[in-house]
Amino acid sequence: MQLEKMITEGSNAASAEIDRVSTLEMCRIINDEDKTVPLAVERVLPDIAAAIDVIHAQVSGGGRLIYLGAGTSGRLGILDASECPPTYGVKPGLVVGLIAGGEYAIQHAVEGAEDSREGGVNDLKNIGLTAQDVVVGIAASGRTPYVIAGLEYARQLGCRTVGISCNPGSAVSTTAEFAITPVVGAEVVTGSSRMKAGTAQKLVLNMLSTGLMIKSGKVFGNLMVDVVATNEKLHVRQVNIVKNATGCNAEQAEAALIACERNCKTAIVMVLKNLDAAEAKKRLDQHGGFIRQVLDKE
């Protein structure tokens, strides 16, 4: 696909005079364009749901979720991956973000990194990619060689693959087994795909990782019951989670958390089933960590 023919490289008539308007009008133009992004994502919800189901199946079987991207796309993958351990208590490495150019590229532009097909393959080899893993290639344009080569290598290994881009029929979309293509149209600043395209990608990644964690029993109701208390704010959140899940008071919630080494799931089962920490943990283990199964089946 030629660059000049890509939707993400097109000229946006709504912002053609943006350099001549007031600051407030400038903000309104950008905001009006941003409003279209959730609608574009809404149109591809079935594709996102299909990807979540595949990711969950692979991760449940011992695989990992691997994000692969360059520039903004790579940074968004790293951002999403880095939030999973503290939010959901998963081990670092279950969700991995890879960026063309390596760690330095998180904060700096690395010239030519996105054009390296070899880089995409080598980065996946370096993390020991296996057929159990799912590789999600992220590229607003859908033409990034680093991502395309990585997806090709992943498919050769037998991995399930997902391609996220904002141009229909792109190489990323056709290379991956599953395509998620929110078409957000031309950017306010021509070609600046960190804007609407980046926002769309962030929304999609939010759904992929959150959907995976919900289906993995990391959420009870709408509570993040595997949150790790790494600071005072999260200590308070743990207490509130146990309170909201059980109806107990703050003192009871704190006592239960202390008794089970601050594991929200265990504390919730302790309170709701009137169990000690050891028995509550045992029942959770018997039901794969799903609070709802412990409550519904016993």
Swiss-Prot record:
It catalyses: N-acetyl-D-muramate 6-phosphate + H2O = N-acetyl-D-glucosamine 6-phosphate + (R)-lactate. SUPFAM superfamilies: SIS domain. InterPro entries: Etherase_MurQ, Glucokinase_regulatory_CS, MURQ/GCKR, SIS_dom, SIS_dom_sf. Residues 55-218 form the SIS domain. Pfam families: GKRP_SIS_N. Induction: Induced by MurNAc 6-phosphate that releases the repressor MurR from the DNA. Repressed by MurR in the absence of MurNAc 6-phosphate. It comes from the Bacteria. The active site is at 83 (proton donor), 114. Its EC number is 4.2.1.126. Pathway: Amino-sugar metabolism; 1,6-anhydro-N-acetylmuramate degradation; Amino-sugar metabolism; N-acetylmuramate degradation; Cell wall biogenesis; peptidoglycan recycling. Keywords: Carbohydrate metabolism, Lyase. It is an enzyme of class 4 (lyase). GO terms for molecular function: carbohydrate derivative binding; carbon-oxygen lyase activity; ether hydrolase activity. Specifically catalyzes the cleavage of the D-lactyl ether substituent of MurNAc 6-phosphate, producing GlcNAc 6-phosphate and D-lactate. Together with AnmK, is also required for the utilization of anhydro-N-acetylmuramic acid (anhMurNAc) either imported from the medium or derived from its own cell wall murein, and thus plays a role in cell wall recycling. Belongs to the GCKR-like family. MurNAc-6-P etherase subfamily. A lyase-type mechanism (elimination/hydration) is suggested for the cleavage of the lactyl ether bond of MurNAc 6-phosphate, with the formation of an alpha,beta-unsaturated aldehyde intermediate with (E)-stereochemistry, followed by the syn addition of water to give product. Homodimer. This is N-acetylmuramic acid 6-phosphate etherase. It comes from Escherichia coli O157:H7. The gene is murQ.
